[in-house]
Amino acid sequence: RLMRKEIRKHEVQAPIYDPNEEPVMDNNRIRELLPHRYPMQLVDKVIALGANSIVGVKNVTSNEPFFQGHFPQEPVMPGVLLVEAMSQCGGLLVLNQIEDPERWSTYFLKIDDVKFRQKVVPGDTVLFRVELLGPVRHGISSMKGYMFVGDRVVAEASFTAQIVKNK
């Protein structure tokens, strides 16, 4: 019992999401900063953006193209796309740290400690919370991300990105 109580103390809390609130960054602004386009732009909006953290939203619908083959009778969002969406949030966070973010891109160098805890299915709203683990140094940034459906962590990962000036 004591061990479970201690574990609960360290559990990650889900961000509070009110779909009626105006986003901090809408889909159009995301497209200005990230090179991804449909069907690979996986962040619908950003609802919180601070110096060291970001919260993004993905509304998963049954019309997502990946559900045609993953899996037709029991659609599940591929884990690799969850990590990609979280990475896109991380890219937005890092780009927010620099001047003229439209002139830069982020490329991921490393992804570690990925854990999938629950399936993501059509109808789910996924919240991505990404935090910087330290300051951006020499264009390199380390982050930790959590993905939530409701108040449950569905996946998590640590990753490192590099900021590169666009040509």
Predicted regions and their residues:
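Segments adjacent to and within acyl-thioester-processing domains across lipid
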Residues: R1-P35, V154-K167
